Amino acid sequence: MTNKIYNHDTDVDIVHKYNAIGLKGWINQLQYIDKEIDKLLNLYAQSIQNKEIPARTLILFSKRKETNKRLYETVMKYSNIYSKAAECDDIQCNMAYLSEYERLRKSYQYHLTRYQKLKTICMITYFRVFDLD
């Protein structure tokens, strides 16, 4: 499926194309989060050795990294399957793809919200320890 929109595309075709673009964006964001968590884990590991922040911080980020990995794998798998959405020839087929996309979108948004909250709380703690505010 090409993501270019043509005049003859139906509304459903256009939605599928936008969703395919959205999936690519999610994949890129989840890859970025994975790299960011690695950097934060290294930073926090050093701080834990110096007893500057609680060890629980490392555990929380490790768990979030695992959650991120699972979601990334799920989105990748679905992204590969989603390319077949253009082959749908009835509303039930289209709705199946769109329903799964919406379910994944909610999981993705929930994950981002949880990650941002964790990062904010941990950064506030980190800055307080070093009195950097």
Task: List the predicted regions and their residue ranges.
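Charge-rich amphipathic alpha-helical interaction elements
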Residues: M1-D133
